[in-house]
């Protein structure tokens, strides 16, 4: 768990972090970073490739990327197989969201490559724009909370997900398929998105990304700001998207326990570098990962 001490509260006072787990000790963000760096080990390319099932569907090699002239990711590698899920965890400022931003085209890439597609169908998408990555490469980015258009109806929000389609009728057709899939949204199709509950808004955000029928979902903090019952609902939806609909998922998740329980593969980032990589359940059982990121 990453919780900062506040005010004059004694360091031994029990506290509850964002994982809803009690802990007898509070570790500052600075200490998490320091201790995580001590745990960091050089993760070889053989380890990275071994965790991906079959030919990698998403492959990042030697990526140096950031914002403006500031480099956040340093020689970063990643591989995930088709229909697999990968969760990125780590201290604040480790570069987790920057990985998603880089895949989707929101960063400056100084060197390295990003490819999508398996085997002979692999395509270099490093220099494509976000619109090209959505329309041509089948990559959708599901932003953090509060990305719906509150004054628009649920139905209109879904139509917006198809803004790159050649014909508006195609977006409307896809919206109807989504309403059939998620009756909870269908019941609210004519209501302003601003009146939805937190869980319903997240469902709408995910559904809007599905309008373009992407192959790869980049999911940024799916549990942030949600009550526990809605968190479970969102991860059930993501589970079905992976295992029933065949989507490949790369996510950043502040609730490291929930993210590692969900994902096939887990990566720990520290200071813009890959510090640890293993199967999600293996990292979940790692006592050092538990101490720093899972609340004990």
Q: Where do the language-model regions lie?
A:
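ABC ATPase NBD Q-loop/coupling interface
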Residues: 113-134
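ABC-family P-loop ATPase nucleotide-binding domain
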Residues: 1-64
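ABC-type ATPase nucleotide-binding domains, specifically the catalytic core motifs of the NBD
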Residues: 50, 68, 108, 154-173, ...
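Helix-to-loop junction immediately C-terminal to a conserved catalytic motif
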Residues: 104
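Conserved ABC ATPase signature
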Residues: 192-196
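Helical segment within the ABC ATPase nucleotide-binding domain
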Residues: 231-246
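ABC ATPase C-loop
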Residues: 209-210
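The feature captures the beta-strand-to-loop junction immediately N-terminal to the Walker
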Residues: 89-91
């Amino acid at each position: 768990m990453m919780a900062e001490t506040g005010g004059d509260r004694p360091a031994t006072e029990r506290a509850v972090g964002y994982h809803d787990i009690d802990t007898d000790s509070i570790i500052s963000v600075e200490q998490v970073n320091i201790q995580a760096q001590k745990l960091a080990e050089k993760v070889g390319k053989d380890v990275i490739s071994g965790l991906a099932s079959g030919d990698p569907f998403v492959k990042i090699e030697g990526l140096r990327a950031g914002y403006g002239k500031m480099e956040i990711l340093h020689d970063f590698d990643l591989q995930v197989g088709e229909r697999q899920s990968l969760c990125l965890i780590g201290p604040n400022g480790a570069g987790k969201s920057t990985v998603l931003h880089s895949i989707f085209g929101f960063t400056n890439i100084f060197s390295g490559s990003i490819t999508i597609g398996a085997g002979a169908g692999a395509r270099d998408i490093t220099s494509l724009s976000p619109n090209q990555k959505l329309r041509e490469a089948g990559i959708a980015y599901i932003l953090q909370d509060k990305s719906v258009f509150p004054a628009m109806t649920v139905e209109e929000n879904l139509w917006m997900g198809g803004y790159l389609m050649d014909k508006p009728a195609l977006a409307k057709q896809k919206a109807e398929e989504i309403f059939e899939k998620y009756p909870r949204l269908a019941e609210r199709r004519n209501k302003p998105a601003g009146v939805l509950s937190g869980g319903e808004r997240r469902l709408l955000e995910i559904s809007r990304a599905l309008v373009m029928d992407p192959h790869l979902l980049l999911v940024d903090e799916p549990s942030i700001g949600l009550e526990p019952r809605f968190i479970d609902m969102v991860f059930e939806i993501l589970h079905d998207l992976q295992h029933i609909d065949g989507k490949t998922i790369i996510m950043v998740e502040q609730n490291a326990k929930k993210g590692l329980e969900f994902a096939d593969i887990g990566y720990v980032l520290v200071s813009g570098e890959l510090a640890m990589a293993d199967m999600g359940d293996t990292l979940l059982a790692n006592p050092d990962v538990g101490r720093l990121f899972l609340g004990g």
